Amino acid sequence: ECDLLIAECLTEGLLDGLDPASLAGLVSCFTYEHRSPTPPDPPWFPSSKARERYREVERLATSLNAAEHRAALPLTRLPEPGFFALAHAWAAGEALDDVLEDEDLSGGDFVRNAKQLIDLLRQVGEVAPDPDTARTARVAAEELFRGVVSASSVVGEVTPR
């Protein structure tokens, strides 16, 4: 749903120059959808650079929505920063208990969101015009694919007899 926005962000360099954990957090804004009936907590960003990048992505999304509206096209979903802190913490190597502490998100929802994020980061790793961004995206995906997230990928596999 955010393909055009992601492509524009890549073209504008909004995903460039970030460390893997911050890139994971920023890219999570394209995949995460707040589903709780309670309002989301205020977003957390690890640095002023990450906060500013999110704001630039948000401005670009708003501009894209305005153009889509004028053209009577379906609107691109706006980015949501509600998973930024969790993605950043998990990519930085924090324990699952610490990541989910004080969060209104089940372990299963965390894993589902992490897997969607890993998939998108791998795609960014393939298409990012900046080689450093492509490499950082691949590293971020690798850093997210651990613990319960990687274990959930082998559950249900059948061993041939």
Name the predicted role of every residue range.
Residues 1-161:
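Non-catalytic terminal extensions of ATP-dependent helicases
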